[in-house]
Amino acid sequence: MQGRFRLPCFRASKIELMPTKLDEILANTLMEVNARKAAADYPALERKAAAHTPRGFVAGLRKAAASGPAIISEIKKASPSKGLIRADFDPPSLARMFEAAGAAALSVLTDGRFFQGSLEYLEAASATVRIPCLRKDFMVDRFQMLEARASGADAILLIVAAHTDETLSDLGDEARRMGLDILCEVHDREELKRAEGLGFKLIGVNSRDLRTFTVHPELVTELVQWKTTDAMMVAESGIGTAADIAKYRAVGYEAFLIGEALMRQPDPAAALAMLLEREYSTEL
């Protein structure tokens, strides 16, 4: 098993005439992943991965969606476009509160340079809750799947804009081999078609183009109309009120990833409970 993760890194994106922000992030990610691979204690990572039984990210969302909106609460400290989002940042505490407030799952940022995240945040958050957790990062190498499961992840993110169909398929296969579910992120009609063609069953729509970091709010409502499979759809942006959730549910979304709108609130869990229109007590 050890040798399997010493393969060369995948090519993460097509070369364009002018480098984009996504290209910059992917290049940095590849460099960091290669450094971690070179220093990795594979037997220890494999033992940690084996000790974590994936909790079924997609199954958890479907169960929640059967009786209401399935919320993926995101534990996010910062972003390249917004800078520091939350200074008072305690992932285990946030995880417990989000679970108590009704989150169906968690998303934890693990990119350090651009989002001030870490695998340690993921591990700490995952260890404190029963609901499944997503490793949200720029996945470019099979090794990251081992890291994800070893850190308590139950699912990983694959961003269509970062990959060819070949690398999407390869990384998807590796995630499934590791027992991890996949949230496949798209931001235009072509990417949706690619994600569906490759058989992804959980597809998220992000209105932010990661190549330019510009936002097109109308994408969330427009793209779902072009869905041609039974994939579960996740709205990943533009959600700030219960009315927003109702609007997106009406056009076909069942799950909702909410990050900044919650993390900027004095009490993120109370804000989540308000979105879900349910009562919440701070006494855990």
Predicted regions and their residues:
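C-terminal helical cap(s) of enzyme catalytic domains, especially alpha/beta-barrels
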Residues: 222-226, 264-284
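Glycine-rich active-site/cofactor-binding loop and its immediate structural neighborhood
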Residues: 79-136
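Catalytic cores of alpha/beta
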Residues: 140-151, 189-198, 239-258
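Glycine-rich phosphate-binding active-site loops on the catalytic face of alpha/beta enzymes
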Residues: 147-167, 204-213, 253-272
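Conserved, mostly hydrophobic/aromatic
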Residues: 25, 73, 98, 148, ...
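An N-cap/entry alpha-helix motif that binds or orients negatively charged groups
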Residues: 18-86
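Glycine-enriched alpha-helix->loop->beta-strand junction motifs that scaffold or abut catalytic
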Residues: 102-103, 128-131, 150-156, 176-180, ...
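Active-site mouth loops of central-metabolism enzymes
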Residues: 72-90, 132-140, 181-185, 234-238
